[in-house]
Amino acid sequence: YDPNGRPVYLKDIWPSMKEIADFYNLAMNPELYKSRSEKIFEGDENWKKLKVPESELYDWDEKSTYIRMPPWSSAENSFGDIRGARILLLLGDKITTDHISPAGPIDPNSVAGVYLRQLGVSELNTYGARRGNHEVMLRGGFANPKLKNLLVDQVGGYTKHFPDGKVMSVYEASQKYKEEGVPLVIVAGKQYGSGSSRDWAAKVTALLGVRAVLAESFERIHRSNLVAMGVLPIEIPDWRGLGIKGDEIVNIQLENLTVRGKVKVEFVRGEQKIEVEGRARVDTNIELDYIKEGGILKYVFNKLLHEG
């Protein structure tokens, strides 16, 4: 309706063919294109006022809460048998990439929210907006409020630290295991990593210190992303039928790892040992190289160094 309360129809605002032709002729003027293209790199006054450091490398701002230098190139390569690992999460079927790495608003009371507020940040924004800050994304790993980790009674980003059985956030547990020098695995059911092909779902898994994900089946793209981050996907039978409780110590033999090869997995609880034959979901020779190098970035870095 217009200001006088009369109804306005599409036909009233639809441009005539003459108006369309006039604007078309204006936009198709070659002189307009030429004048704009000649100054395309000059920018306006605000663009010209931006301070740009002269450097061949990006000048990382350590105070930034949006973009931080990620640790991908500095992390140590730890390929080899996985021994004495603990289960960080015990999950059911259809765990999505949003369960693994949420993209929505950051809860002020979440681990990531508390971290940002301690830095004096008032507008927390979303995980998606802060995906350039690995410190935020790491704290957001498996922090989806709807996640059900079967190691604990409550929903959300919680788990148990073993052997003490203390309940804490997934982030806190991962850091505690890191201090103790304990490698980690995740055990899940069918269709692990379904949903959108979110790269941070694989990145945060690696950042949490997870060496392998053991599941009944994997979503295609997430499986590939895990391999690219140096995390080994292993298919195993339904863990619920194996008698696994989640407090076991896990050993995985990888000495003779091959493409889609068999992998021996042991779940040890006291004197009890459950032996499982898994299958490495490393589907090509190049993926095998990625896993052995600790991920695709390290593979590329090492290749460039050797060629140089």
Where in this protein do the model-derived segments appear?
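Fe-S-dependent hydro-lyases/dehydratases of central metabolism
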Residues: 1-308
